[in-house]
Amino acid sequence: MYVVDAIRKEPYRDPANGNYIWRPPYPKSKPRERPVRPSSRGDFDHPRPGSRLFSAATAYASVRCVLDIWEFYLGRRLSLVGKSGQRKFEIIPRVTALGDNAWSGEWYIELGFADRNPRKPYCENLDVIAHEVGHIILKHVIGPTPKGRLEFERKSHDEAGADLVSLVSILHFDRVVDAVLERTRGKLFSVNILSQIGEYRMGWSGRRAARLLFQNKTMRSVAHARRAGDKYVYARPLLGAAFDILVEIYEARLVGRGLIPKELANRSTHATARGHPAIRREFAAQFKANPDGFADALREATADFARLLATAWRMARRTGVTFSRVASNIAAADARLNRGRYGETIHRAFARRGITVRVGRS
């Protein structure tokens, strides 16, 4: 894996439609900035924020971080270059011509700028990078996208899956955990930092994505998206169900630690903080008494959730991908890893969205 800080580079794919114009590797004859070198101490602490060196170092560190996290949960190393013959994965941190976008392929990731603003490079946004790396992880773990009737649902699943890769990755940072809990006072069934993961430019449309993880979309309510070919909107029920599962696992961990009573967790399920202020006040009082315990519960829930996803995606290489099959794989993963500890939560979350969990699928 290496960074190429290319100068005046044209995107590998057409920003208008996503079709490939040319492919990596970036030719050595084309202009580029000098590579970042370690200090005499062997670290990379010296690049100044706002500089191209900082962007390059940050992009590399972010990709490596996401891979390290998910290789741990998957239990194996991931090769990023496939069978292309290209020996190294290429990271291009600043591609102005890409505009307000970021994308990845079998051999590379290249990143543009939020609002086309050169002061807002996506290469310094871990959410964006983790989402793009998520696409690569899913392709390597599950396999290539099939052609035919299952193609659309697989692509839609991968948009949700890439956001979940980002969600889990970001929750490995203590500052994020602390900030989320401080802002929500421990009640995560709400619109917050976590529930807005993946909310950046959507595909090639240039429209701001509204992919809130905390929402009530069902398969019936997004049926029009399938007819319109909108994989982002169609993914919302799957994404919302997965977020519900994470939060309910977190609340189960709080109950197990004696930090909240079980009846509060039961009342909290998908109840908004704004619509149910009494529940928020109860959470706030419990959180104030032991914020560190809440943080530990969220870390434990994140690990449980990531293991379920990793196991379900490994199964999907054999079962194939539909929303129902992936939901069933998550239930089967829980039976295998946790003896069905979260089975009721998983079935309820997917049933609420109109996604069928088939008992016994593994």
Model-predicted segments: where are they?
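Zinc-dependent metallohydrolase catalytic domains
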Residues: 53-56, 60-108, 112-126, 138-362
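Acidic/polar low-complexity interaction segments
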Residues: 1-64, 68-72, 80-84, 139, ...
